[in-house]
Design a protein with these regions (language model features):
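Phosphate-binding loop and its immediate beta->loop->alpha context
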Residues: 32-133
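Gly/Thr-rich phosphate-binding beta-strand-loop-beta motif of the actin/hexokinase/Hsp70
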Residues: 2-30
Length: 133
């Protein structure tokens, strides 16, 4: 932590949603929520106050069309946030939710077991990898 920084940042890594807030010490505005840019559906980007704690494992043919619309570079092959939740509602066997809960499970921390009911052709990932995606 830098004591000379004009900002303080708070991060809530929730089981259902994550959020970021900040305060500028030299301004009277108080704390503010930082909007998080994310894909909210196919070809649709938006900035929202929370990032749903969902990870979607796209089909190979979906991957470039989904991740190619992001305004930032990513080496990640998974989609997180609202778009992950929306696409996962359509294809639930490719959706990971509540990964934070698996962090305390003996097998779930580092073993690649998620998504639990994934098709055989889908590479599974660990709860730690989901939490850092």
């Amino acid at each position: 932590m830098n004591p000379d920084s004009p900002f303080s940042i708070g991060i809530d890594l929730g089981t259902t949603n994550s959020a970021l807030a900040f305060i500028h010490h030299e301004e009277a505005e108080g704390s503010q929520i930082l909007s998080i840019p994310q894909l909210i559906d196919r070809n649709l980007l938006d900035e929202l106050p929370t990032l749903p704690s969902f990870l979607y494992c796209p089909l190979e043919e979906e991957s470039s069309s989904l991740l190619g619309h992001l305004k930032w570079e990513t080496a990640n092959e998974h989609l997180v946030g609202t778009g992950a939740r929306v696409l996962g509602e359509r294809t639930p066997q490719r959706l990971i939710s509540s990964a934070k809960s698996w962090l305390c499970h003996q097998e779930g921390q580092k073993q690649a077991i998620l998504p639990l009911y994934a098709p055989e052709d889908l590479a599974k990932i660990s709860a730690v990898d989901v939490a850092t995606a």
